[in-house]
């Protein structure tokens, strides 16, 4: 066999292997970017040697074989995939090809949409009633998932409105919002079930359940983006108008569909969506650009596996492959031991990544990770990079097991893991330098006592020099002692002392949050402060009484009760009060008695806020008598929508729930 033939054979074999893992096993081994790279390489070689193209080459078809666990459905109109572009130059080349083929571009308009990262499906309606649903499969034959699709609430079982075709096959994407993905994995970790690497895998695994009752428990949703079969009816002559028609018939359509009349407008749309991507609430991996006119689409036609009139403009990969060089263990403020993978540095989503969290011992076991392994790293938005998969087929012979410590790597105290918890913890408490540092950093942080100018490096030095052991020791510092720290002159030292004095005047809620009670965030601290009013009342509260606070369950109540039952914690609180930490006398008012537009209401925040942090907004709302929930339901009274609000806003509008923007929230807060 000639070298070029050998190379082509190996590439095709590798691609088929990855297609099988992706489409059939729902367990991809490499990120999409690596698959795309291999496919581009194969196409390039085949274009140079067209005589060596085989009918079964991955470039000549859409995907892999369908699952055999479901009955098979042959698509009347093939479900083709799209060609990809990865940079502006490639998109402009696509635009030029379109213009050259059309000759006249006077009426050329692009319809731009989100490229959803889920599972492509076709749904057939006969006389407006859902009768069949199928996966894409290999583009020609898919799997019958009708029973499962019927459980997805976003998908109407019957269309409504006028002029519905006798047979209409719509196409779209089933996907899992980020909140639903986190909920599924949280439950899986609690029960010992399967933990999914990403929302796409979770959506695929949920949709391909043989038992529809399991699918029904998964919060899947759907956006419609196209049509296959059309009989006994008519549709508008443009893609964008068709989407509006689908929406009128009750099919969910993304609200981020935009018409662009120039290539420059398309690039602006791409950049805007990329900026909003972390706040959407669901995963996308690019934008889809389609010629809007159906007549022009027909004129442009198709190539072997994709239309000439559309392209997927993909974002920089959020997943990349690299090697694990070592695993180290960090100690948090509550003693949690967190394994961290030290990586061969790699660029992911535009950022150089050299570390990734491994969460806990269970996660290492689930991944089957060893030191030396080739792994897939994922970084989405501001999320800490994490290892999502191990490329087992490329494990080196000298790979070493990860050994979880039995003693704290900082203070050598015993490490214990409470039954039922995933996290192992150092038992050293404040004798552990790492816990002491992290507790003090939390205490002075902006959302706690907000000590201006006291950064992490100052805290590190204060602990290492043994100037500070408890939070109360901070208020005993003098400018003279602080000048003994690195890069701390007399003026800077006095500024820190002044900031500490200013920080003594705080609020009860901030003080509670600063104490660092396990599971007590800002909103919970605000709820506890509002409910009990005084420190004395909170210290004396039973677990049962604590659970009467909105959103405080048995876990938070137990941690709070145990914190105040610990004599050393009460001593630290007494010392803080003795040093002059104080807050205004409480005015305890029941929620129904609070004169506030938020009192007694269940409120949901969505999107990004520009004037307050999410936690600050929650705390303010709770203080005014609101209950802040994490998801929209029929019990929700009000949704506050910031920039790039996603699926929560859409659901609120669907349910007819009142929606206000950030400016209106600030006005109602009295700002």
Curated annotation (Swiss-Prot):
Q: Which residues form the active site?
A: 115
One Pfam family this chain carries? DNA_ligase_ZBD
Recorded hits in CDD domains, A to Z, give: BRCT_DNA_ligase_like, LIGANc
Instruction: Provide the binding site for Zn(2+).
Output: 408, 411, 426, 432
Biological process terms from the Gene Ontology for this record are: DNA repair; DNA replication
Provide the reaction this enzyme catalyses. NAD(+) + (deoxyribonucleotide)n-3'-hydroxyl + 5'-phospho-(deoxyribonucleotide)m = (deoxyribonucleotide)n+m + AMP + beta-nicotinamide D-nucleotide
What Enzyme Commission number(s) apply to this enzyme?
6.5.1.2
User: Is Acyltransferase tagged as a keyword?
Assistant: no
Which InterPro entries does the UniProt entry name for this protein?
BRCT_dom (IPR001357), BRCT_dom_sf (IPR036420), DisA/LigA_HHH (IPR041663), DNA_ligase (IPR001679), DNA_ligase_AS (IPR018239), DNA_ligase_CS (IPR033136), DNAligase_adenylation (IPR013839), DNAligase_N (IPR013840)
Alphabetized GO MF terms: DNA binding; DNA ligase (NAD+) activity; metal ion binding
Q: Name one GO cellular component term.
A: cytosol
What job does this protein perform? Answer: DNA ligase that catalyzes the formation of phosphodiester linkages between 5'-phosphoryl and 3'-hydroxyl groups in double-stranded DNA using NAD as a coenzyme and as the energy source for the reaction. It is essential for DNA replication and repair of damaged DNA.
Family membership: Belongs to the NAD-dependent DNA ligase family. LigA subfamily.
What is the name listed in the Swiss-Prot or TrEMBL entry for this protein?
A: DNA ligase
Q: Which organism is it from?
A: Klebsiella pneumoniae subsp. pneumoniae (strain ATCC 700721 / MGH 78578)
